[in-house]
Curated annotation (Swiss-Prot):
Pathway: Carbohydrate metabolism; tricarboxylic acid cycle; oxaloacetate from (S)-malate (quinone route): step 1/1
Coiled coil: none
Substrates-to-products reaction catalysed: (S)-malate + a quinone = a quinol + oxaloacetate
Cofactor(s) named in the record: FAD
Protein name: Probable malate:quinone oxidoreductase
Primary gene name: mqo
Pfam families assigned: Mqo (PF06039)
GO biological process: tricarboxylic acid cycle
Tagged with keyword Oxidoreductase: yes
UniProt keyword list: FAD, Flavoprotein, Oxidoreductase, Tricarboxylic acid cycle
Native source species: Gluconobacter oxydans (strain 621H)
UniProt record similarity statement: Belongs to the MQO family.
A GO MF term: 2-hydroxyglutarate dehydrogenase activity
InterPro entries: FAD/NAD-bd_sf, MQO
Length: 500
């Protein structure tokens, strides 16, 4: 017979990816007495956007992603977004280091590896931009370790494959931060859920699709999940629901009926990678090398040639190549997008489409792009690449947020966003990049935004300070605290850089 805590849990989490597993593990740190139920449609955790080959595993820290540092009209570079992403990743480092110290995660090398983050550009205009970006960033303590060079010989030491066979008459430049990371968010999700399953107050139900999410008269949430194999349904009552279901978060949010979600819509974007697993090639490249997106293309199109370490093996990934699919998840239905349109969000969706014809044009061109054209993009990064060494891999689905910015006029937003109802009893994660890299930041925002009454000295606050040693400290302003924190977390996680 099911226990009372499993029928009336304190917390229900929908989705068993990196977002839900991170929040569940953090809540357990703050209050081990909380009972939690997690529902996942698939047969295991971390199989959608958290799965290693469904995301770039960059450990987004604003080091190399040029779309986070736009150039102003006067030629100066705005680094505010890069700083925000950079210090959000510090939250992830603090949380992961805490779990390693506490034994929640046995081996950090199973999910995080040191990997330099490099920005590479060519052409006089792009070189001038990168130099201006470097000067703006290296002046701030968060990026003080950034290196810059326009010497092809030095770049060849940093990223040999990127320079072999390159036209040396063309201006080229690069920046590097040695202490970057490659993160296997699928492996991290598995480690967290394995730890959660040892707790009798946590119940995880795989092969269970949430089919109903309604409010009861007493203010609780009735959540019904149906076993996708047997058809048997489970119904639980809870005071708090977290929707961390990736692309499927929007339909679930709509199912809840909260007014805050009324006009939200989603725009699904699929993706492709090229992958190389030949050790003779992969051993020659150890870095995340990000380029500059073509003029007029969306932020999601920033090309990069990445080292990935998956299941202990080093691989190379290049992309992303965008596409269009009406699915909200890789395992979803072709009808997902159409079923998400309602009388209240179709106008925001249409106006967002009208305002983003450039994006639509880009996606159409990407969809009809030939394999030869895709490979040409790789040759821009790796001039001596051979087609026979690379295979095509379908990436995870992303659902970009569309929300009204004035009246019913919809605005397409790139990023990750939390949507919660007025009494803070339900919250959902919407959006895409930086996504998994800021799971710790998202979890902390949920705690702060939905449980403020518990963040006091006699309750969760002291423990929260233990989990996040720099809690309440603005790392963008406190250089000493930032340096200490990064040194300590690098040592615990085994990601300290080596000179060279």
């Amino acid at each position: 017979m099911p226990s009372l805590s499993s029928l009336c849990p304190d917390i229900v989490l929908i989705g068993a990816g990196i977002m839900s597993s991170t929040l569940a593990a953090l809540l357990r740190e703050l209050d081990p007495s909380l009972s939690m139920v997690m529902f996942e449609t698939l047969s295991d955790c971390g199989q959608e956007s958290s799965y290693a080959w469904n995301n770039a595993g960059t450990g987004h820290a604003g080091n190399c992603e040029l779309n986070y540092t736009p150039q102003r009209a006067d030629g100066s570079v705005d680094i505010s977004k890069a700083l925000a992403v950079n210090t959000e990743f510090d939250l992830s480092r603090q949380l992961w280091a805490h779990w390693v110290r506490e034994g929640r995660i046995a081996d950090p090398a199973a999910f995080v590896q040191p990997c330099p983050h490099i920005s590479l550009v060519w052409g006089a205009e792009n070189v001038a931009f990168l130099k201006a970006r470097y000067e703006a960033m290296v002046a701030h303590h968060c990026f003080a370790d950034m290196e810059y060079t326009d010497d092809p010989a030095v770049i060849a030491q940093w990223a040999p494959l990127a320079m072999a066979g390159r036209d040396t008459t063309q201006p080229v430049a690069a920046t590097r931060i040695r202490e970057g990371t490659d993160v296997n968010f699928g492996a991290l999700t598995h480690a967290l859920t394995a730890s959660l399953k040892t707790d009798r107050s946590v119940s995880i139900h795989y092969n269970h699709r949430v089919t109903d999410l309604t409010r009861t008269e007493d203010g609780r949430w009735r959540v019904t999940a149906t076993d996708t194999e047997s058809g048997h349904a489970i119904t639980v009552l809870t005071r708090f629901v977290f929707i961390g279901a990736g692309g499927n978060a929007l339909p679930l949010l709509q199912k809840s009926g909260i007014p805050e979600a009324t006009h939200y819509a989603g725009f699904p974007v699929s993706g492709l990678w090229l992958r190389c697993t030949d050790p003779a090639i992969t051993r020659q490249h150890h870095a995340k090398v990000y380029g500059k997106a073509p003029v007029g293309s969306p932020p999601m199109s920033v090309p990069h040639l990445d080292t990935r370490v998956i299941d202990g093996k080093s691989c190379l990934l290049f992309g992303p190549y965008a596409g269009f699919s009406t699915k909200f998840l890789k395992s979803g239905s072709w009808t997902d997008y159409f079923r998400s349109l309602t009388p209240k969000n179709i106008i925001p969706a249409l106006t967002a489409g009208k305002d983003n014809l450039g994006l639509l044009d880009y996606l159409v061109k990407q969809v009809i792009q030939t394999n030869e054209a895709r490979f040409q993009a790789l040759l821009d990064f790796y001039p001596t690449a051979r087609p026979e060494d690379w295979s095509k891999v379908v990436a995870g689905q992303r659902v970009q947020i569309i929300r009204p910015d004035s009246g019913l006029h919809g605005k397409l937003r790139f990023g990750t966003e939390l949507v919660k109802n007025a009494d803070r009893s339900l919250v959902a994660v919407l959006g895409a990049s930086p996504g998994a890299s800021i799971a710790a930041s998202v979890a902390l925002q949920v705690v702060q935004g939905c449980f403020p009454e518990r963040l006091v000295e006699g309750d969760w606050l002291p423990r929260l300070r233990q989990v996040f040693p720099a809690y309440g400290v603005d790392l963008t302003q406190d250089a000493a605290a930032c340096a200490t924190l990064r040194r300590d977390t690098a040592q615990v996680l085994g990601i300290a850089s080596e000179a060279g």
